[in-house]
């Protein structure tokens, strides 16, 4: 039986752990899917490449507003797809080749799960191909998978998820998206901008319900002018109609469409690992970790979607850096270890308009009993926003009265994911709203002035 110093399950952020410090250690890397994980292959990177194409199309369609006549002759979907995966697929292949060429690394390309802990304390790992090996330390970085509602599964109807929809052979005329979160909002934007009719089936009353209420309500209102929203509805059955689908909703209505995209969230892969055999605790579907990313089993760490509630690549990367350091420390030597910092975890939704957030929502701040000040600033109130003729972009800031401490920032509009970065920095380094507003120059007439004005408007 093969024996290793370290085994890593998953090649997303977990694949970044083995650097030159591990050259003397024998390692196993286990990956059942495409090398590189969700972000590289079916998540952050390809989706943003599709979003960029959508932004180009949207800009062309809106050009007449600025005195420029332009139109789209056609969308060459094959070329859109080829541009994306012609660049991404070679990265996955070269990443696997790089690991296979390392003299101290073996790659296992099937699903891997835990077996019983060995008498010497080493962890037994088993692959679906029948291979068995042991490791002294294990990193669980097995990621997550899409959630499919039971009614859709039971119906037997054809569906896509974010894992598959970017490789469809041709653009549909009409797509139905079941879901209301980040993934649903981004793909609604992509397909709509490329000329596809979009219908969203939403269980609640609004899109992006995890966002601050102001953002959620305004975004849903904007979305309703572009996409058909079926709110307070669930799919109860479905049928295949030729190459399309017919979905029956709980109000008795039927929606006919060419393609169904299920975007109802993702779930940790912790339940697929037989983690209990290794003494690894799993709660609410996720591997439990402490601030050092240690699990309940000595020598076993976890990171990313399999253990984190955030399901964000930048969080997984941060946790991977923590694990990378702590693997080289004695298990009990927490003085030498570093801890994860999840105080201010930002997120962005690359939809239209773009959305970004960090910290508390207004409702969360109120629920904590904090005395708060809130300011909402329109993009159109500053020179660059006025030049753009922007009528929907906003910056919403929440601070604690008295201390001026920034509690939350929520932005909807052009380049929201970039505009929010200095606010993340201010929160991380303890700057007050006043210090941030008056302690630096703000370039005029640049769009970040909307952040400056929001800061100055706080009382």
From Swiss-Prot:
BP term (GO), one? 2-oxoglutarate metabolic process
Its keywords, alphabetically, are: Disulfide bond, FAD, Flavoprotein, NAD, NADP, Oxidoreductase, Redox-active center
Q: Which InterPro entries match?
A: Class-I_Pyr_Nuc-Dis_Oxidored, FAD/NAD-bd_sf, FAD/NAD-binding_dom, FAD/NAD-linked_Rdtase_dimer_sf, Mycothione_reductase, Pyr_nuc-diS_OxRdtase, Pyr_nucl-diS_OxRdtase_dimer, Pyr_OxRdtase_I_AS
Sample GO molecular function, one term: NADPH binding
Show the disulfide pairing. Answer: 39-44
Q: Where in the sequence is the active site?
A: 444 (proton acceptor)
Which reaction(s) does the protein catalyse, per the Swiss-Prot or TrEMBL entry? 2 mycothiol + NADP(+) = mycothione + NADPH + H(+); 2 mycothiol + NAD(+) = mycothione + NADH + H(+)
Recount how this protein's activity depends on pH. Optimum pH is 7-9.
Key word NADP present in the record?
Answer: yes
Q: Which cofactor does it need?
A: FAD
UniProt KW Disulfide bond keyword: yes
Kindly state what the record says about how the cofactor is bound: Binds 1 FAD per subunit.
Q: Where is the signal peptide?
A: none
Q: Tell me which EC number(s) this protein carries.
A: 1.8.1.15
GO CC annotation: cytosol
Q: Where does FAD bind?
A: 31-39
Please report which protein family the annotation says this sequence is part of.
Answer: Belongs to the class-I pyridine nucleotide-disulfide oxidoreductase family.
- Assembly with partners or alone: Homodimer.
Q: What does this protein do?
A: Catalyzes the NAD(P)H-dependent reduction of mycothione (the oxidized disulfide form of mycothiol) to mycothiol.
Stated name of the protein:
Mycothione reductase
Q: Which species is listed as the source?
A: Mycobacterium tuberculosis (strain ATCC 25618 / H37Rv)
Mind giving the lineage of the organism this protein is from? Bacteria, Bacillati, Actinomycetota, Actinomycetes, Mycobacteriales
């Amino acid at each position: 039986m093969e024996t290793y110093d370290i085994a890593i399950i998953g090649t997303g952020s977990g694949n970044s752990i083995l650097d030159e410090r591990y050259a003397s250690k024998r390692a196993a890397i286990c990956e059942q899917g495409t090398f590189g994980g969700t972000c590289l292959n079916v998540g952050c990177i390809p989706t943003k490449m599709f979003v960029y194409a959508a932004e180009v199309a949207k800009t062309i369609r809106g050009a007449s507003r600025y005195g420029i006549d332009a139109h789209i002759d056609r969308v060459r979907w094959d070329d859109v797809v080829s541009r994306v995966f012609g660049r991404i697929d070679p990265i996955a292949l070269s990443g696997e080749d790089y690991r296979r060429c390392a003299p101290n690394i073996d790659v296992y390309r099937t699903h891997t799960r835990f077996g019983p802990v060995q008498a010497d304390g080493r962890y037994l790992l088993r692959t679906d191909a029948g291979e068995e090996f042991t490791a002294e330390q294990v990193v669980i970085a097995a990621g997550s998978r899409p959630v499919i509602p039971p009614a859709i599964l039971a119906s037997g109807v054809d569906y896509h998820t974010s894992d598959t929809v970017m490789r469809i052979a041709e653009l549909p005329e009409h797509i139905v998206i079941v879901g209301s979160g980040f993934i649903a909002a981004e793909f609604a934007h992509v397909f709509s901008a490329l000329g596809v009719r979009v219908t969203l089936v939403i269980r609640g009353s609004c899109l992006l319900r995890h966002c601050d209420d102001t953002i959620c309500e305004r975004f849903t209102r904007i979305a309703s002018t572009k996409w058909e929203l079926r709110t307070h509805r669930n799919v109860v059955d479905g049928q295949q109609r030729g190459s399309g689908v017919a979905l029956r909703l709980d109000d008795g209505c039927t929606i006919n469409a060419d393609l169904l995209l299920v975007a109802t969230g993702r779930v940790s892969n912790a339940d697929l690992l037989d983690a209990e055999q290794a003494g690894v605790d799993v709660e609410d579907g996720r591997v439990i970790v402490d601030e050092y990313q240690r699990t309940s089993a000595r020598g076993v760490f976890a990171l990313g979607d399999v253990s984190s509630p955030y399901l964000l690549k930048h969080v997984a990367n941060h946790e991977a850096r923590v694990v990378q350091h702590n693997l080289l420390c004695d298990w009990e030597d927490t003085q030498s270890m570093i801890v994860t910092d999840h105080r201010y975890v930002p997120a962005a939704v690359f939809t239209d308009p773009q959305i970004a957030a960090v910290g508390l929502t207004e409702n969360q701040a109120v629920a904590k009993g904090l005395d708060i000040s809130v300011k909402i600033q329109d993009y159109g109130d500053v020179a660059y926003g006025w030049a753009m003729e922007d009528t929907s972009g906003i910056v919403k800031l929440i601070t604690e009265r008295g201390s001026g401490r920034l509690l939350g920032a929520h932005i909807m509009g052009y380049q929201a994911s970039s505009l929010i970065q200095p606010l993340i920095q201010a929160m991380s380094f303890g700057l007050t709203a006043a210090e941030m507003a008056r302690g630096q120059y703000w370039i005029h007439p640049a769009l970040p002035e909307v952040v400056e004005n929001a800061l100055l408007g706080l009382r």
